Swiss-Prot record:
All copies of domain TFIIS central, residue ranges: 217-347
PROSITE patterns reported for this sequence: TFIIS_CENTRAL, ZF_PHD_1, ZF_PHD_2
Protein's recorded name: Transcription factor bye1
Organism: Schizosaccharomyces pombe (strain 972 / ATCC 24843) (Fission yeast)
Lineage: Eukaryota, Fungi, Dikarya, Ascomycota, Taphrinomycotina
Compositionally biased residues, Low complexity: 153-164
Length: 721
């Protein structure tokens, strides 16, 4: 066996450190093979090039250079030549076994070795005998040829060495605790990797202080939880909750934040950066915990009746006030019962109609077998699907009455009697636009859950008490018309109760309720410069109309008002209001400071009458309306409907089947209400309460075309059941 000398010359000792990747194949490319790192010089080598299989990589490994420099073992010091011979034999034997499975076994002669040794020169003298662990023509797993033919041997001298010698290869010297293997090219040192692992383990553990949290998002959430727990603990004590003396807001905040991150973010993404689910759950939990309407939920969390692990998995419905949930469930059950009652009322109602038909036939002198005059009961009517139907039903008729009775023009006595009887069958049975003339003031489930005051179209009643300590500005408020009372709300931020005073512009109480409903919802925020630029352009647009109102909080020093006011002032932003009316193009809410200063936006508006010395802060609402749309809607609200919903002139089907001329009379409200049976009222109520489109947009309840289609769909659904 031929081996190199282990003597290091002065020239070799002065050689600069090797590169990070230094394999015996002289290649630094990553070909997808397994890499192994030396415990001595931290250089990386292909495992296949040094004769190691993937399953045989030891815990500690030393390259050929570091192995020759190791002088820890006394056995190596006493007989270095023998040890080198054993080590070389081990490498050759291991490499030979690996080559039998993957490649052909090639042998190089000693003459080839001497030729290569002369070419390598001083560099070859400073290398280790273990570097000759490959035979001539040996290729790596990727199939590439080694650029230099390593020195091999036909028969190792130490072939009698036991297998334990191979396992001990690379274990001389220091011992390592981790196997250094990598499927990719090495880029970081083991020290950096261990530091990253330690930092990751520290970040995933439960922290004892907020300063230990490295991620800025998690640190911000933890600080917010500290503030929330301090607030809700004080609220719970005022609400009479006992056993909260030992609670530590910081400890609770760190525990909840850690569980939120581990359950909602890290378990799913395996990343130290919180995901969107983590952020959304934080907003939902914070809103429900600080909600004054939900003290029961807050007390259960503080008394640990709901653990943090269960808390982060609760839905919005599970966190809601239990009283409101029970009330909503009762409403749903009542709606179901109403549907069943409506189905059972159909048969008795038919019998009543038969008796009524006989009575009216006697009075009007109509033959008993003439069924053409009597329309079907409202419970069986079907609304028209399209205008082009060949046989229009009575639903397509206009809600108008004929000026004269076409059935008995000669019989004056019967005609007078029919004129006096406004509740007669022929005068009232044709279907009318019930939602347009009947007030629908039953609260929906959404209104009950949110506890919003019910808005009515004909009158205005304030469910809240006015502010008491505004004597300084009472004269100004007395001069302004209060046109709205409700709640100003921005989700996840704050809300407060307020009255709206008309500053300028033509707007009525009913119109403002139509725009805002009972809650003025702030959808988002917008920069001040954008609003200024927009209103500056509106000055040159005559087709737009601007209405301004002043939102005055109904409770002095309202905490919700202060939070929302500071939210916009600190960010130098205006709010964007949600409008439910098509006539409103844009709507904004502007913070009004106290004192004499006013926002720059007021210079672009008509002269606004405000108190000279304002002692309090307010919000001003600005609504940009389309003049044509607002005028058209006001006309529609004031003028009765005299045409059908599809724009077809009103007609009435006579007994002979010939339609009469269009008429423009409108039935009285009393006659319409008398014409509706209990089942009709239940049907209308069921549609208004349970139709998802009406719940999303309540203004659809006064849309005749939509209500006709909705009632028709409900009738068809009930008939199939």
């Amino acid at each position: 066996m031929v081996r190199k000398s282990t003597r290091r010359t002065a020239k070799a000792s002065e050689k600069p450190p090797e590169t990070v990747v230094r394999c015996v194949c002289k290649s630094q490319e990553d070909i997808g093979d397994t890499w192994v790192q030396c415990d001595g010089c931290d250089c990386w080598q292909h495992a296949s090039c040094v004769g190691l299989a993937d399953k045989d990589i030891p815990e500690s490994y030393y390259c050929e250079v570091c192995h020759s420099r190791s002088d820890v073992s006394s056995q190596v010091q006493n007989s270095p030549n023998k040890d080198e011979e054993h080590q070389t034999a081990d490498l050759l034997a291991s490499n030979e076994g690996n080559e039998k499975n993957n490649e052909e076994n090639n042998v190089v002669s000693s003459d080839s070795k001497e030729a290569i040794t002369k070419e390598s020169g001083a560099e070859l003298e400073s290398s280790e005998p273990a570097s000759t662990n490959s035979n001539v023509g040996m290729t790596t797993r990727s199939g590439r040829q080694s650029p230099r033919t390593p020195i091999g041997s036909t028969t190792p001298k130490s072939s009698h060495s036991p297998p334990s010698t191979r396992k001990r290869r690379g274990s001389v010297g220091t011992t390592a605790t981790h196997t250094k293997r990598s499927k990719n090219a090495p880029k970081t040192s083991p020290k950096d990797a261990s530091n990253e692992t330690a930092d990751q383990e520290k970040e995933l553990s439960l922290h004892t202080s907020i300063d230990e949290i490295q991620n800025p998002v998690r640190k911000s959430v933890a600080k917010a939880w500290v503030s929330v727990f301090e607030k809700i603990i004080e609220k719970a004590k005022l609400e009479g909750v006992q056993g909260l003396e030992d609670l530590n807001s910081t400890s609770l905040a760190l525990q909840l934040e850690h569980i939120m991150f581990m359950v909602l973010s890290y378990t799913t993404d395996h990343s130290l950066t919180p995901n969107n689910k983590y952020r959304e759950k934080f907003r939902a939990l914070r809103f429900n915990l600080v909600d004054d309407k939900n003290p029961a939920f807050r007390a259960r969390v503080l008394k640990n009746e709901i653990s943090f692990n269960d808390l982060v998995n609760l839905s919005s419905e599970e966190m809601a006030n239990p009283d409101l949930k029970n009330l909503a469930e009762e409403i749903r059950q009542q709606s179901t019962e109403n549907t069943v009652i409506k189905q059972h009322l159909i048969a008795p109602r038919d019998r009543l109609l038969d008796e009524d038909k006989l009575t009216q036939q006697d009075e009007l002198g109509i033959a008993e077998n003439d069924d053409a005059m009597f329309p079907k009961p409202p419970g069986e009517l079907v609304a028209p699907i399209s205008i082009a139907e060949e046989e229009p039903t009575i639903d397509s008729k206009s809600p108008t009455l004929p000026e004269h009775n076409p059935l008995s023009e000669d019989d004056t006595s019967n005609g007078d009697k029919a004129a006096k009887r406004k509740g007669s069958f022929n005068d009232t049975k044709p279907i009318v636009n019930v939602p347009s003339i009947v007030e629908i003031d039953d609260p929906t489930i959404l209104d009950i859950v949110e506890e919003e005051p019910l808005a009515r179209n004909d009158s205005f009643s304030s469910p809240y008490s006015p502010a008491e300590d505004m004597a300084e500005e009472s004269e100004f408020f007395g001069m302004k018309e209060k046109i709205w009372t409700g709640k100003v709300k921005m989700a996840t931020v704050s809300e407060f109760h307020a009255n709206a005073l008309n500053l300028f512009g033509d707007v009525s109480a009913s119109h403002l309720f139509e725009i805002l409903s009972a809650t003025a919802l702030i959808e988002g925020r917008i920069s001040v410069s954008s609003v200024l630029q927009y209103f500056h352009a509106l000055r040159k647009t005559p087709s737009k109309e601007i209405i301004a109102v002043l939102f005055v909080p109904t409770e002095q020093n309202s905490q919700g008002f202060d939070i929302l006011y500071d939210y916009f002032v600190k960010r130098n932003r205006y709010g964007v209001l949600h409008s439910k009316s098509n006539s409103v193009k844009d709507a904004y809410i502007i913070p009004m400071p106290s004192g004499n200063s006013v926002p720059e936006l007021l210079d672009l508006l008509p002269k606004v009458d405000l108190p000279k010395d304002r002692n309090f802060q307010y919000f001003m609402g600005l609504f940009v309306l389309n003049k044509s749309s607002s005028r058209h809607e006001s006309v529609e609200r004031a003028t009765p409907i005299t045409t059908s919903t599809n724009g077809i002139p009103s007609t009435y089907q006579s007994a002979s089947g010939t339609p009469t001329n269009p008429v423009h009379s409108y039935p009285s409200l009393e006659s319409i209400i008398n014409a509706l049976t209990p089942s009709d009222m239940l049907l209308i109520k069921d549609v208004v309460e349970n139709n998802p489109q009406i719940r999303a947009n309540p203004s659809l309840a006064i849309n005749p075309q939509f209500m006709q289609n909705a009632i028709s769909a409900a009738q068809k659904k009930a008939s199939k059941q």
